[in-house]
């Protein structure tokens, strides 16, 4: 551009509309040769068209601090919607408008075309489940969660039409950070997960827009504010005991190592009692609220069928959680290494139901019942553990909506992201009973996506050899694994089931525990 004074006095030429192909060649703009003109003055920054969502946050990366201070503060967006057009053509049997990554997942899922056509909404539900931006592992997990950019809600599908527009509401809720876990010997796909709550709102009556906006406002008010790290640390200081656990406990022996913490056995110096100690590095915990939740629940809820919380200490950023030690290990070792008879299974189910009846009576849902979270004493005692995922329910919120637990043990209403109540624990107990029969939960050998589809659509899973089970046991399983939540038994009801009257004494579990330990030694 020339610095000629004459050009400086000329007004700028009107802007010329150019097609994108002119710039795509990479050469000089051919039109510029015909106009010895200065470019149009730049539009003031405040008036630039910009993306409503991205530009609010991009200033921290591109703009200077000075500019930030000059601009009025703008709060992050709330209640914004990300619309995804996903349809299902009943004639061709194909989804339309599906995100590319979901399409790739579906292609390798082993969900047949017939299954997709039979229940396309269930397919979308399980694809949403695999949205890795919302799937979280619990604390002490061995592998850090992967993050991916996905829409945060599952499109709702209207199968009556060939294509529908689905509105996905992205909420800034408590469950969005990477999440806390327990050490489990199973493959990654059997580990506990935690995902954001996504429930489609009940549509407002036609023409009554105020009802919908009022409901949203009410939901916002009910949502509890997210605690800052400092608030969490302050809360922890009010919960824990003062002192140094290294002085109160001795003979530390490591029995487990996770990505963000370690589990030891140790001995109480004063009492000579053997305990289990979780040492958790809080700096590595992106979901610290779950730790507070677990401590508070275990502190308040004392029951013979729940692993006893003993104490907790905070030393710098290290949290020490001291718990009762059960030397028999987890029920997983027994179900994978030995064969249980029906009377032994009945004994374990009875003890777990006693724990669940107590929890549910205290308005607590465990949400992660599986053999990994049932610990055994050498004398055969059976106790539930791992309350990082438990949820309290109130009269105002009698149903939960967060997808949480472990995929193969999940109730259908959780997989399909419906509101749920305490009976999700009963379904998981039924799956655990099948574990005790077959050594693993149903669908474990299926592709995980297809397994979720089958859980969502099949109802009660089929047993490998149902004829080998007594009618009374099959009836107990059917009561636990009833697809209709209203017909599914409660913990209180199932404690009266005739199957539990077959239970052997708990001491009958001791030979199984010893056999499992021996088998595991041989496998090393």
Curated annotation (Swiss-Prot):
Q: Organism's domain of life? A: Eukaryota
A Gene Ontology biological process term:
adherens junction assembly
Residues bearing N-acetylserine? 2
Which residue ranges are recorded for the region named Linker? 88-248
Positions carrying N6-acetyllysine are 62, 128
* Catalytic site: 368 (proton acceptor)
Q: Which residues are annotated as modified residue Phosphoserine in the UniProt record? A: 2, 20, 55, 58-59, 64, 141, 152, 197
Q: Where are the residues of the annotated region Autoregulatory region?
A: 69-137
Question: What residues bear Phosphothreonine in this entry?
Answer: 60, 134, 143, 154, 159, 169, 402
Residues at site: Cleavage?
Answer: 212-213
Record-linked InterPro entries: CRIB_dom (IPR000095), CRIB_dom_sf (IPR036936), Kinase-like_dom_sf (IPR011009), PAK3-like (IPR051931), PAK_BD (IPR033923), Prot_kinase_dom (IPR000719), Protein_kinase_ATP_BS (IPR017441), Ser/Thr_kinase_AS (IPR008271)
Region of interest (Disordered), ranges: 1-81, 142-190, 204-228
Family to which the UniProt record says this protein belongs: Belongs to the protein kinase superfamily. STE Ser/Thr protein kinase family. STE20 subfamily.
| PANTHER family registered for this protein in UniProt | NON-SPECIFIC SERINE_THREONINE PROTEIN KINASE, SERINE/THREONINE-PROTEIN KINASE SAMKA-RELATED-RELATED
Q: How does it assemble?
A: Interacts tightly with GTP-bound but not GDP-bound CDC42/p21 and RAC1. Interacts with SH3MD4. Interacts with SCRIB. Interacts with ARHGEF7 and GIT1. PAK-2p34 interacts with ARHGAP10. Interacts with RAC1.
- Descriptive protein name: Serine/threonine-protein kinase PAK 2
Give the organism the record lists.
Rattus norvegicus (Rat)
Q: Lineage of the source organism?
A: Eukaryota, Metazoa, Chordata, Craniata, Vertebrata
């Amino acid at each position: 551009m020339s610095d000629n004074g004459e050009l400086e006095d000329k007004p700028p030429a009107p802007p010329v509309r150019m097609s994108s192909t002119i710039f795509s060649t990479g050469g000089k703009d051919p039109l510029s040769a015909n106009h010895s003109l200065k470019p149009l003055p730049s539009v003031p920054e405040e008036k630039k068209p910009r993306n409503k969502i991205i530009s609010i946050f991009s200033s921290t990366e591109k703009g200077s601090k000075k500019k930030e201070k000059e601009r009025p503060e703008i709060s992050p967006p709330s209640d914004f919607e990300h619309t995804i057009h996903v349809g299902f053509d009943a004639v061709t049997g194909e989804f339309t408008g599906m995100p590319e990554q979901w399409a790739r997942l579906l292609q390798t899922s082993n969900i047949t075309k017939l299954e997709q056509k039979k229940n396309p909404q269930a397919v979308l539900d399980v694809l949403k489940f695999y949205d890795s931006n919302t799937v979280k592992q619990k604390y002490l997990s061995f592998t850090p969660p992967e993050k991916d950019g996905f829409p945060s809600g599952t499109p709702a599908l209207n199968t009556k039409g060939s294509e529908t527009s689905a509105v996905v509401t992205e909420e800034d809720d408590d469950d969005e950070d990477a999440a806390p876990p327990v050490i489990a010997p199973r493959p990654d796909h059997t580990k506990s997960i935690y995902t954001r709550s996504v429930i489609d709102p009940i549509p407002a009556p036609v023409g009554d827009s105020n009802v919908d906006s009022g409901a949203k406002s009410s939901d916002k008010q009910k949502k509890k504010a997210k605690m800052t790290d400092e608030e969490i640390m302050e809360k922890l200081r009010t919960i824990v005991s003062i002192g140094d656990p290294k002085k109160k406990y001795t003979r530390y022996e490591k029995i487990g190592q996770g990505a963000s913490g370690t589990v030891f056995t140790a001995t109480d110096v004063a009492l000579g009692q053997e305990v289990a100690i979780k040492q958790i590095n809080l700096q590595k915990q992106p979901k610290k609220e779950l730790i507070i939740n677990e401590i508070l629940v275990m502190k308040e809820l004392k029951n013979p069928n729940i692993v006893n919380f003993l104490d907790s200490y905070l030393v710098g950023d290290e949290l020490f959680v001291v718990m009762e030690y059960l030397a028999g290990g987890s029920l997983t070792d027994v179900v994978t290494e030995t064969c249980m008879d029906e009377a032994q299974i009945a004994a374990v189910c009875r003890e777990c139901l006693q724990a669940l009846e107590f929890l549910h009576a205290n308005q607590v849902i465990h949400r992660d019942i599986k053999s990994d979270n049932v610990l055994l004493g050498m004398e055969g005692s059976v106790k539930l553990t791992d309350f990082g995922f438990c949820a309290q329910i109130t009269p105002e919120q009698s149903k939960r909506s967060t997808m949480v637990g472990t995929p193969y043990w999940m109730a259908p209403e959780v997989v399909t992201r419906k509101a749920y109540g305490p009976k999700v624990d009963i379904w998981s107990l039924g799956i655990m009973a099948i574990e005790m029969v077959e050594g693993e939960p149903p669908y474990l050998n299926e592709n995980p996506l297809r397994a979720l589809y089958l859980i969502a659509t099949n109802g009660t899973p089929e047993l490998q050899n149902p004829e080998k089970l007594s009618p009374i046991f099959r009836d107990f399983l059917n009561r636990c694994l009833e697809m209709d939540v209203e017909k599914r038994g409660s913990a209180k009801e199932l404690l009266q089931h005739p199957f539990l009257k077959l239970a052997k004494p708990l001491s009958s579990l001791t030979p199984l525990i010893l056999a499992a330990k021996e088998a595991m030694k041989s496998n090393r």
